[in-house]
Amino acid sequence: MATMQLQRTASLSALVFPNKISTEHQSLMFVKRLLAVSVSCITYLRGIFPERAYGTRYLDDLCVKILKEDKNCPGSSQLVKWMLGCYDALQKKYLRMIILAVYTNPGDPQTISECYQFKFKYTKNGPIMDFISKNQNNKSSTTSADTKKASILLIRKIYVLMQNLGPLPNDVCLTMKLFYYDEVTPPDYQPPGFKDGDCEGVIFDGDPTYLNVGEVPTPFHTFRLKVTTEKERMENIDSTILKPKESKTQFEKILMDKDDVEDENHNNFDIKTKMNEQNENSGASEIKEPNLDCKEEETMQFKKSQSPSISHCQVEQLVSKTSELDVSESKTRSGKIFQSKMVNGNNQQGQTSKENRKRSLRQFRKTVLHVLESSQESVLKKRRVSEPKEHT
């Protein structure tokens, strides 16, 4: 019975992430699935759609939720259609970046409260990862096993981060913006379900914090995920789990092209491997959260003998210890609920000061965005942006 269950779990895992990635087509299918899993995990753990909008899959022994079309949940069905449009642009090698944004005012989708940035890279011969070994005839040394382990590590990071962020407001909306490699994308191209859009005047509602969640390389693609969220949603996280260094970054950097410049001012989101030995026969035992570290990232420099940006030791430990993540529904569906430590009078005063600070931040960012856009018009060509024809 146990053997049959293990075989079933392995087959379900292979359905999500194939065991072998040796062709460009296999890599494309892998990246599509990784994007679907990432978006599904984020929306599930942030409680954006109801439970019925998700199916269940397994990555090794990690259970993940996959978004599906549900006629009783128009929002989830709409997001699935957006994903199909992303697949079209990805398959044509046009897609450069996806920004999935959360906003709270249905009449103002340009003022966002949280966003997730997915980036893809290509070469003229097709998509290829960043890390190339010069002494191997320009062929990547990344194996399928490395890619799969990096993928599971990324999903684990998403789980840990989403579980520990403060909850979103009860009523939120989603929007999506697609950016392209304009030099190869036809000027009249639009993915199914999308139309011409722009990112001018986009502002962040609050004080943003930036996190580099991670990236997954294949022999043909590089998939990268970054998160921008309200700083206050991180302030209540246990300091032993998440340790941010003070770093001020303007919101406009989310739209930058050059990763080596952009990454200098973002925070790394690293999982430290501080784990206890487990009983060999312990199945789904009670689990502890791994320590997280949010620190300023240095400019990446890849030496000739250097492996991809994931540590083999770190990945091996994390992949083999799946029970270190708590994926209980009570914690993941709505975020942690933090109790205020202030008395009523002080709490009311604190809320007023927070509102005043947010108002001043919004006014400041509106001014900054306007100045930056006007000053860059003569230097930078305006990039094409697509947005959904219908919002959730």
From Swiss-Prot:
Null mutant phenotype: Mice develop normally without obvious somatic defects but males and females are sterile. Although spermatocytes are present in testis tubules at epithelial cycle stage III-IV, they undergo apoptosis by the end of stage IV, and post-meiotic cells are not found in testes, suggesting that spermatocytes are eliminated at a stage equivalent to mid-pachytene. In females, ovarian development is grossly normal, eggs fertilize and embryonic development arrests at blastocyst stage due to aneuploidy.
Q: Where is this motif: Nuclear localization signal?
A: 381-384
Residues recorded as bearing Phosphoserine in the entry:
375
Q: Which residues cross the membrane?
A: none
A GO biological-process term: meiotic cell cycle
Q: Where does the record place the region Disordered?
A: 323-359
Domain HORMA residues, every copy: 25-227
- Composition skew (Polar residues), residue ranges: 341-353
State the tissue distribution: Specifically expressed in meiotic germ cells.
Describe PTMs of this protein.
Answer: Phosphorylated at Ser-375 in a SPO11-dependent manner.
- Could you tell me which Gene3D superfamilies the record lists for this protein? HORMA domain
**PROSITE patterns reported for this sequence:** HORMA
One of the record's GO cellular component terms: chromosome
Q: Which InterPro entries match?
A: HORMA_dom (IPR003511), HORMA_dom_sf (IPR036570), HORMA_MeioticProgression (IPR051294)
Enumerate the UniProt keywords alphabetically: Chromosome, Cytoplasm, Differentiation, Meiosis, Nucleus, Oogenesis, Phosphoprotein, Spermatogenesis
Q: What is annotated about its quaternary structure and interactions?
A: Interacts with HORMAD2. Interacts with IHO1.
Q: What does this protein do?
A: Plays a key role in meiotic progression. Regulates 3 different functions during meiosis: ensures that sufficient numbers of processed DNA double-strand breaks (DSBs) are available for successful homology search by increasing the steady-state numbers of single-stranded DSB ends. Promotes synaptonemal-complex formation independently of its role in homology search.
Protein name from the UniProt record = HORMA domain-containing protein 1
Organism name: Mus musculus (Mouse)
**Species lineage:** Eukaryota, Metazoa, Chordata, Craniata, Vertebrata
